[in-house]
Amino acid sequence: MAGQGSQKKKSCDWSKRYVDHLNGKMKCFHLQMSANFGHSMTIPNKFLDHFGGTLSRTIELVSPKGIVYIVKVTEHMNKTILQCGWEAFVDAHHIEENDSLLFRHIENSRFEVLILDSDGCEKVFTCAGIKKTSSVQERNAAPVDISRSTHDETTQSSGSKKFVRCQRASDSQRGKTAKLAETSSSGESGEEGTDSSTSEDESSYELDDPQMPPGRNYVLSRWTSLSEAQEEKVDMLVQDIQPEIPVFVAIMKHSNVNSRRACLVIPKRYASAHFPLESQTITLQRQGKNKKWYPMFYIRKDGSGYMLYGCWKNFVRDNHVKEGDMCIFHLTKFTGGEFGATVHLLRETKSGSLGSFHTSHKRFDLRDGRTWPKVTGVRRVSSRPYLTADRVSLTEEQVRKVEEVVHSIQSEGPMYVSIMNKSNVGTDGLYIIIFGRQFATRYLPEGEQTLTLLMTGKSNAWQVKMRPRSGDAQMITTGWRHFVHDNHLQIEDICLFQLMNDESKLTMTVHIIRRNEKS
């Protein structure tokens, strides 16, 4: 008991001296790690009063090695808790019960963290890293063990932006790496992945090199192939977002979404070229949504494996990601310079239209690039002064609304009718419009074109790109997103595209019939 009291006294005395240098302002708080600290941590209310009782929704923890971890702040039973991202910080620094942490507020929502052992002495972190104990392995969200060897490791200081590189140890000094549990053919870990036996064999992570299909601006994991329908979906998205570097396309497997330790392996060459050089928290965001997720990007100590884990499970859960869905990672940097990716989620459906999906009997429901809502009381219009997409039917109510608009316009030029769906308005990550073969071959010029869109009653003009598509159809991609947002288009709205014959350049006037608009 006396020993424990002296340990606490050391920590408190050290903390007091540290705070005395801060000009009388409360910038620090000190906590000793008690039981169950590994999953969450409560911030003292007295310290929170300095911030008016609240913190921002996320904070940044700067480790002794200069690595920045983004941790989510939540409220529970009148307590402010660090949760999502905290476990990754604990695991990375091998924090144990009775260790002490001193948090120093730097600016905004950023804190420097000093880690003290149970004796009140600062923990020293070498470049070679520290062997993990079994207790850490049990709570670690990653389904792999860390290599026990010295190795090349590059750290980047978040303050000075300087790089520190460790000396490479000779091969004879390297320990044996921990063997992974049985992995899938794409090199991703299985559901449990906790086998800690050692082996000289190369990990399957080292074989998980990316594939870039010829002429495509995206990367696939090794052993992954896309059906024609999937390729078409990805091509449409890539043409729309115009990425500076290839996007990463991952088809979700059981280990990515359903495993207790769900994670996502990033191909080695792709990750080493485009992801951070150090294990750290990164930011994921969905297109058009404000919410962010902060999974841990983890680099295996021998450099053979790269993965997302930890709060990756939260991303999967919150976005209802299922096995067979496609996640397309568009790498970018968000406000403040934090590294992250915008994730475009393309769902797998069970409709029997186009393209086999993986090894199951499921299909992507494209229907000329669309996922059409089910309608009742359907009849196909035969003789009409407008055209629709192939295989598209209108309800009697929709026909009546369309014909009222067509009659009021009295257009001499041809008209094309399109019912907005997920792929048209960005709900599934795409912003495209397909002009069906019959309309495209009869009225539209061949090859890639710039098309001007006008709106009745508005002076704005939108420039969009129109590109050829298989089957003699034409597709609007780049620029269509702005038209959708500016005109607040929603699913089941109807757009009538009126081709203007008296314009010097290719132009269409768009007439919108809102879903809830009454005749």
UniProtKB/Swiss-Prot annotation:
GO CC annotations, alphabetized: nucleus
Keywords, comma-separated and alphabetical: DNA-binding, Nucleus, Repeat, Transcription, Transcription regulation
Native source organism of the sequence: Oryza sativa subsp. japonica
Protein known as: B3 domain-containing protein Os03g0620400
Biased amino acid composition, Acidic residues: 189-209
Keyword Transcription regulation (UniProt): yes
Residues in the DNA-binding region annotation: 26-119, 249-349, 416-516
Domain of life where this protein originates: Eukaryota
Classification via CDD domains: B3_DNA
SUPFAM superfamilies reported in the protein's UniProt record: DNA-binding pseudobarrel domain (SSF101936)
GO terms assigned for molecular function: DNA binding
Tagged with keyword Cytoplasm: no
